[in-house]
Structure formats: structure tokens, C-alpha cells
Regions:
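Short pre-catalytic strand/loop immediately N-terminal to key active-site residues, enriched for Gly-Thr
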Residues: 176-184
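C-terminal folded domains that constitute the principal catalytic or ligand-binding module
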Residues: 188-193
Length: 241
């Protein structure tokens, strides 16, 4: 019997055939009248927000799609990825939680550079806090915008992609494992956001409207039981005058 979650995943996947309909749905949304919280009759008990290192850092977190025209170095990209590393090279203990220490979400990177040889498909190795080269790609800015279904200015340096491998977690938690997989990806996304918030030289933005199958092909994962969950595009910050 087919898992209903996979029907949901297939229904919500974006392809070159349904991306226009998805865009029309977004453009027709009334953002001025959206609901942002629940309402109850009693007034809330209000507490003063105490300052801490974490609270100061979270205030710096923001989504930016305006990049500078220079490229980040690989070491700068690694400043972001290192937020996902393991502790003491122990893969069951990392900087973010995972149900049953399954760590069913892997991180891949499409890096961009001035030279074609710098356009690489990379796998992030959390155990060694490093990247392994898988192949090269030939994506330009126009193609990147179409694959991400977003517009940006300037030059992005990398597209970080989170890919789920559900067999690692459903074998223990059955269909409930899909929820845990999405929670894990969300925790990873937050780690990336906080890592970027620490730097004045790096900017970035979460990307949710990815073309699933096309990106999985670029990652050479189209034959695997893998699910493209979400991504994060990063680049050099625009220099202030």
C-alpha cells in the first residue's frame, strides 16, 4: 500500500509543468489581509524580553536576496555549513536535533564562481566538517532563478539544498517519521540562518519553491529514495557606501 505522505509530496512538488499555476496562486494572494495570530478575549500577560547572546543574534536574522557582485570563497561558505557539523566527529550528536539520532536529512551545495570550473556540486560531510565534490554544473543566474522560483539581484555564491532520505527514519517511526524528517530540516535551516546572522559579509534567504526533480537530477539523486525538502541561497553582502 502506498504511503499517503508520498501522495502529498507528489501533489506539492513543483515541476516545469505546474510552476506557472503555482506562480499565479502566489500573485493572487492578498498579503495585506493575512492572519498572523490567534485572538482570545483575555489580554496576554506581558514579560520583558531579557537580552542574551541568542536573543541578540536572532534579532540579526533576516532574509536577503540582494547580493554583491563578488563571490564568497569556499572557506566563507564553510563558515555557514559548519553550523551543521557533528560534535567531536560523532555523527549521532550534531548541532541540531534529530528523532532517534537518525539524521535523515543530508546537505548538498551548488557552488557558483567566476570560472566554469568553480561551479560545483558538493556534498557536506558533517563528520569531518568538509565538502566532497560530486560533479560540475553549468547553471547561470537566469537558470538558478527558474530552479528556485525566486528573483534576486547581484551574484549568488551557493545554493544549499536539504535532501531527506525517509527510509532512515520510517523504518523506526513508520509514517510518523516523515514529520520528524521535516522538523529536522527546519532545525537545519535555522542553524544556517543563525550562522549567516553572525556575519556582516554573508547574506542569504530560505528557498521553498524549488523544482524538485530537476535539482535531484543535478545532485544525481533521481534514482534514490530521496526527497528535496528546502534550500537556502547565499551570497556576498552588498557593501554599504
Amino acid at each position: 500500500m502506498r504511503d499517503p505522505f508520498l501522495d502529498f509530496w507528489e501533489e506539492s512538488s513543483l515541476t516545469k509543468y505546474n510552476i506557472r499555476e503555482y506562480g499565479s496562486k502566489m500573485s493572487g494572494f492578498d498579503a495585506d489581509n493575512k492572519e498572523l495570530k490567534l485572538s482570545y478575549p483575555k489580554y496576554p500577560v506581558v514579560f520583558k524580553n531579557k537580552k542574551s547572546k541568542l536573543s541578540l543574534l536572532t534579532k540579526l536574522r533576516k532574509s536577503v536576496r540582494n547580493f554583491g557582485n563578488s563571490y564568497l570563497s569556499l572557506s566563507q561558505i564553510m563558515q555557514v555549513l559548519t553550523q551543521l557539523s557533528s560534535k567531536e566527529k560523532d555523527l549521532e550528536h550534531r548541532t541540531y536535533p534529530s528523532a532517534g539520532a537518525s539524521y535523515c536529512v543530508e546537505t548538498f551545495v551548488l557552488s557558483f564562481g567566476e570560472k566554469q570550473s568553480e561551479n560545483k556540486v558538493l556534498y557536506y560531510d558533517a563528520e569531518h566538517n568538509g565538502v566532497q565534490e560530486i560533479s560540475n554544473h553549468d547553471l547561470n543566474n537566469n537558470r538558478i532563478e527558474k530552479l528556485c522560483n525566486i528573483s534576486f539581484s547581484g551574484t549568488p555564491s551557493a545554493l544549499i539544498l536539504f535532501v531527506g532520505f525517509p527510509d532512515r527514519i520510517t523504518i523506526k517511526y513508520s509514517s510518523r517519521g516523515y514529520r520528524f524528517m521535516l522538523i529536522e530540516a527546519g532545525a537545519m535551516l535555522q542553524q544556517i540562518a543563525l550562522g549567516i546572522a553572525q556575519s556582516k559579509k554573508i547574506s542569504g534567504c530560505p528557498v521553498g519553491g524549488l523544482l524538485d526533480d530537476e535539482l535531484l537530477k543535478i545532485l544525481k539523486l533521481e534514482q534514490e529514495n530521496s526527497l528535496l525538502i528546502t534550500g537556502y541561497i547565499i551570497g556576498a553582502s552588498v557593501k554599504k557606501p
